[in-house]
Design a protein with these regions (language model features):
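Conserved pre-motif I regulatory segment
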Residues: 2-47
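Non-catalytic, well-ordered alpha-helical scaffold segments
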Residues: 29, 54-57
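A substrate-engagement module of RecA-like helicase motors
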Residues: 2-18, 69-165
Length: 165
């Protein structure tokens, strides 16, 4: 294991200083070592670890310390947002590293202004649903102010709402 990784995960390392209640987990350190070696050797790696192992930091720490560009794909938007808004900035600060990150999402995650205009103008894109017109009006008000068009900004609108295609 690279001594930098070992130091990061130790009882008095940067993670312990940055995270109240931090506890050293040998499994986490072992996973970080495996990830670090795979990154250094440019080899693929598949890792399985149980709940509470600390998988997120075990792959993020070696990725950040490698200095390489790394792509991290998540299974859920919730984890994606957690990494982008919380975990990566926290680790960058704890490790004293400048971190450049970008959040990439597919086009289904963004407002289509053309479809919104059609729905508002014709109403034909909306199935029969009580309250759909109010919901559409709310989306239209949001669309007038959003800078990104990221549908995640509409936190009070369920992903299963009938107004989404």
């Amino acid at each position: 294991m690279n001594s930098d990784y070992k130091d990061v995960f130790q009882f008095e390392g940067p993670l312990a200083r940055a995270l109240p209640g931090y506890a050293y987990r040998p499994e986490q350190a072992a996973m970080a070592k495996a990830v670090g070696l795979a990154l250094a050797r440019l080899e693929p790696l598949i890792v399985e670890a149980g709940t509470g192992t600390g998988k997120t930091f075990a792959y993020l720490v070696p990725a950040l310390l490698s200095g390489r560009s790394v792509i991290i794909s998540t299974g859920t938007r919730t984890l994606q947002d957690q990494l982008f808004h919380r975990d990566i900035p926290l680790l960058g600060k704890a490790l004293g590293l400048p971190v450049r990150i970008a959040l990439l999402k597919g086009r289904a995650n963004y407002l289509c202004r053309h479809r919104l205009e059609l729905a508002c103008g014709q109403g034909s894109l909306l199935p029969d649903e009580r309250g759909a017109a109010r919901t559409l009006a709310r989306v239209s008000r949001w669309a007038a102010t959003t800078k990104s068009g990221d549908l995640a900004e509409l936190t009070d609108l369920p992903e299963q709402s009938s107004i989404w295609p």
